[in-house]
From Swiss-Prot:
The keyword Zinc applies. Belongs to the peptidase M20A family. DapE subfamily. This is Succinyl-diaminopimelate desuccinylase. The keyword DNA repair does not apply. It catalyses: N-succinyl-(2S,6S)-2,6-diaminopimelate + H2O = (2S,6S)-2,6-diaminopimelate + succinate. Binds 2 Zn(2+) or Co(2+) ions per subunit. NCBIfam families: dapE_proteo, PRK13009.1. Its cofactor is Zn(2+); Co(2+). Zn(2+) 1 binds at residues 68, 101, 164. InterPro entries: Bact_exopeptidase_dim_dom, DapE_proteobac, Peptidase_M20, Peptidase_M20_dimer, Peptidase_M20A. It comes from the Bacteria. The active site is at residues 70, 135. GO terms for molecular function: acetylornithine deacetylase activity; cobalt ion binding; succinyl-diaminopimelate desuccinylase activity; zinc ion binding.
Amino acid sequence: MTETQSLELAKALISRPSVTPDDRDCQKLLAERLHKIGFAAEELHFGDTKNIWLRRGTKAPVVCFAGHTDVVPTGPVEKWDSPPFEPTERDGRLYGRGAADMKTSIACFVTACERFVAEHPDHQGSIALLITSDEEGDALDGTTKVVDVLKARGELIDYCIVGEPTAVDKLGDMIKNGRRGSLSGSLTVKGKQGHIAYPHLAVNPIHTFAPALLELTQEIWDEGNEYFPPTSFQISNINGGTGATNVIPGELNVKFNFRFSTESTETGLKQRVHAILDKHGVQYDLQWSCSGQPFLTHAGKLTDVARTAIAETCGVEAELSTTGGTSDGRFIKAIAKELIELGPSNATIHQINENVRLDDIPKLSAVYERILARLLAEKAV
């Protein structure tokens, strides 16, 4: 196998306009390719979402790669320097929607599997891939549903690598070994609409909420710890008023979000918000939505193996980090003993002219192969 195979597979995937939750047969392509080296494929589709569980072997330990074939919309196509679904090599980079997030990672792991199986046909344990077409969307019928199926039948993962783009300045310089939780609130502050010249006949919800808002934004929710920064509270939207300048609004709508560390809990944060609102006499309705709990993989075998593979291939020392947004790792951690995220540069994800460095592609595949070898080869390498 030559080093161009990862690039060619990445191009084949990028050329399929799989805007979430559309898969455009990307998973079929992966299944056909991996079938040739002994992977069994199980389709687990829910609604418009396509998921596939691919596995070679029946024994532990199970090394799983998790990824998604869906991509975000392109944005204005005319602003791209080349068509977003026509993978283009230019200036030492591969351009196309999904190049970084995350079709290159998928391609690199598949080719890593091909080389590893050719070298170690009787490897220990099992290799698996969990691929969904619903990561960039609502993420309701994707990985979370597959995890439910696997959990129900007692199918666990020992080591999981999520192929999200994690590199900052150079391939391999960062490994995500955890993520913060995400808790959102949709708050409706109740008032009484009236003429702005007669405030005594109305209740201005903006005014009643203002003291509570100040306290919420100044509250220290926790101090964080050695793995996580302090929990953050951010207002994303505030809407009130009719648009007229002479009407006191009858209600105020506020949307906010917590990114919380393992030092806080979903229940605890909710209780503290309600206590602050009640303290200031705010009349309100509040709806909550938690899209993920914080999780952490402590430094151990998987992080050690990954850092060694990166050092040998890329010549850099990987930093362990929990920064950034959420990923499907938040679902998989329920059945995975150790989980990390490791992929190409995240500098252009979701942007116009999304791209990856061409010379990073064979390196990433080599990193994945070294990880497989150190975890599953017949003999330690």
